[in-house]
Amino acid sequence: SLALMMVVLIFEFGSDYSTKLVLEGAFICFICPTAAAVAVVTEKLGGSIGSLTTYTVIANIFTMIIIPSLFPMVEKGADVSFLMMSAMVFRNVTTVLVVPLLLALLSRRFLPKWVDKVKNVKDLGFYMWCFNLTILMGETVRNMLHAEVSGVTMLLLLFVPLLVCLLQFAIGKTVGRHFGASISAGQALGQKNTVVGIWLTLTFLNPLAAVAPGAYVVWQNLVNGWQLWYKEKYGKLKW
């Protein structure tokens, strides 16, 4: 619904180039699927990995349907057919989500001793996530340096994702609190697969808007870092 709201705003105010650019950036931050690495942070925070993994798979499948439906309305130049765009999104989602999942299942089935050794390495998943984050941060800085936009537009592309990030974390935690799953719900809605978001922006929307999902990486991981610090210091989260 938030992504649909952004589509309406683009229709209403998209005649101005800079305004449309910022709105496209916000739109992609809303419509990005849940990050595959969300389970790493959720486990650290004490959330439910099982329910979150199920949600992540469902959310990524839903993304393959809704993105081809909305993108032609956001960017007129995105004249790729529904089936073609679905296939392209499916290929990307499969690469970052389904293939690692299948490899994990096959490893547990045929290489149980090796899996046990990997599981015994303390915080391995966390450090791998940090390594991936470093690459994404570098990509974000590169996009910023090469973006030919005004200073005001650049600031909006950097700070509008902060509002989007806080809003999605807040909505997820508020809804999840009613079901005793505020941590899992907050991470599910707030932690986005910005790799897919950047790819979608560069492929189908205005490439300059890719600064927004890149900035979202920074904000969501500042939120994650604060949560991890708070959990480590006080033993539980306040929100």
Language model region names:
Residues 1-239:
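Alpha-helical transmembrane segments of multi-pass small-molecule/ion transporters
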